[in-house]
């Protein structure tokens, strides 16, 4: 974006998703549902902590609501055009969408925004990645979920 206020908004949203969303939602879900299965017990591996998963899933709802509000008030999360903020949010969402942990039915605006972002050619290589032994959710590769 050209205007300083628009650049600030992009950076604010990038920090929101890369720090807050990661700490409260995507980080714990990926750690508990994926990383732990490949880690030694002495390194923190083992059975997933269901209380952590439950809390992170609740936090996803809160963040999804915020994404929906942004998507209803703007074309993209930080303004009229896609920015790094959209990519940051979509990257975190794609990780938990892979696991099937995004309640898309709870916010149509967030769902429509994510469908637009993941339909972009630059995002498609991300959707082609698969993890052996962990099948992707139905919505992960479906562009019109």
Residue ranges and their predicted role:
Residues 130-145:
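Acidic/histidine-enriched, glycine/proline-rich intrinsically disordered or flexible terminal extensions
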Residues 2, 26-30, 128-130:
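Short coil/turn segments at secondary-structure boundaries
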Residues 16-17, 143:
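Intrinsically disordered, low-complexity segments enriched in polar/charged small residues
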Residues 3-13, 87:
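Alpha-helical scaffolds flanking conserved acidic
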Residues 17-118:
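GST-like fold's C-terminal all-alpha helical module
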Residues 44, 126-127:
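Short, structured secondary-structure boundary patches
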């Amino acid at each position: 974006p050209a205007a300083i206020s628009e650049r600030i908004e992009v950076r604010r949203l990038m920090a929101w998703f890369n720090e807050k969303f990661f700490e409260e939602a995507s980080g714990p879900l990926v750690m508990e549902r994926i990383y732990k299965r490949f880690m030694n017990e002495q390194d923190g591996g083992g059975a997933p902590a269901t209380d952590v998963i439950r809390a992170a899933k609740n936090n996803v709802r809160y963040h999804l609501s915020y994404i929906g509000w942004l998507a209803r008030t703007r074309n993209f999360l930080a303004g009229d055009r896609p920015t790094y903020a959209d990519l940051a949010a979509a990257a975190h969402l794609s990780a938990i969408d892979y696991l099937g942990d995004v309640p898309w039915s709870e916010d149509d605006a967030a769902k429509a925004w994510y469908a637009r972002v993941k339909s972009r050619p630059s995002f498609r290589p991300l959707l082609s990645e698969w993890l052996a032994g962990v099948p992707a959710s139905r919505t992960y590769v479906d562009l019109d979920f």
